[in-house]
Regions:
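Extended carbohydrate-recognition surfaces in non-catalytic/accessory domains of CAZymes
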Residues: 4-115, 162, 168-171, 183
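Generic detector of bulky aromatic hydrophobic side chains
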Residues: 27-28, 46, 129, 211-215
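Accessory beta-strand-rich segments of carbohydrate-active enzymes
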Residues: 51, 80, 85-188, 193, ...
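Beta-strand-rich binding/interaction modules
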Residues: 122, 201-219
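Short, solvent-exposed loop/linker segments at the N-terminal edge
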Residues: 194-201
Length: 219
């Protein structure tokens, strides 16, 4: 369940968190809503240029693929055909262990950029598509994971012409794995606005909260 909470700050004042009556960022047991682990996810990907059948399958044999680290741009391998339509596949295997406390945390993959159109698969399951090559996109992959080895696959389609400048093709920016507690502030879930007054500025902070099933009763 997701909810929105608003805090207003006037000049020379400090308001307590309306969610708990405590300082922002903690629940009644002292656990931080913003407690998260950010791990760079750039190394040891496998890449293939071209379209292949069943490459999203976790049992697909990618031993002949090129091993790459991100950021990666496949167009630079053939500078005489920079604007040729093409498809690229990226695969990465990693080990996942649930939270040691027994609480199921949330696992988010953040792609800072994949040009041009991307489809993401986890353990063979198609989770979705992203059609905006220049913008960051996030996927909650928690429910598709299992303990032990897991396979992340991204299929990227490049079509030309699509830009007035050189765009590159592939996962051309960093990828992050982010682990969040069940109850957390979503990524990009804090919004601020200000209004000028005769005494200065009134600041409004809107904060989204994603509630875990065991988050307790908050008023």
């Amino acid at each position: 369940m997701r909810s929105l909470h608003r805090t207003q700050i006037k000049p020379n004042t400090c308001r307590k968190n309306k969610i708990t009556g405590q300082k922002p960022g903690s629940d009644r047991k002292g656990k931080n809503f913003d407690e998260r682990q950010n791990v760079i996810f750039d190394r040891n990907w496998y890449f293939y240029r071209g379209d292949v059948r069943n490459a999203e399958s976790p049992v697909y044999n990618d031993s002949a693929w090129r091993k790459v680290d991100l950021p990666h741009d496949w167009l630079i391998y053939d500078t005489k055909n920079l604007y040729e339509d093409s498809i690229g596949w990226y695969r990465k295997n990693f080990a996942y262990a649930p939270d040691k406390t027994g609480n199921d945390d949330r696992v988010i993959l953040r792609f800072e950029g994949g040009y041009m159109d991307s489809s993401i698969y986890v353990n063979g399951e198609h989770l979705g598509d992203w059609k905006y090559g220049y913008s960051t996109f996030d996927w909650d992959i928690t429910d598709a994971l299992h303990k032990g080895d897991n396979e992340i696959v991204l299929r990227v389609v490049f079509q030309a012409p699509n830009s007035r400048w050189y765009s590159g093709a592939g996962i051309y920016r960093n990828v992050w794995m982010i682990r969040l507690p069940k109850t957390h502030i979503p990524l990009d879930g804090i919004y601020t606005s200000s209004v000028e007054t005769k005494n200065g500025y009134d600041l409004t902070i809107d904060t989204e909260l994603e509630w875990g099933t065991d988050s307790g009763n908050y008023e």
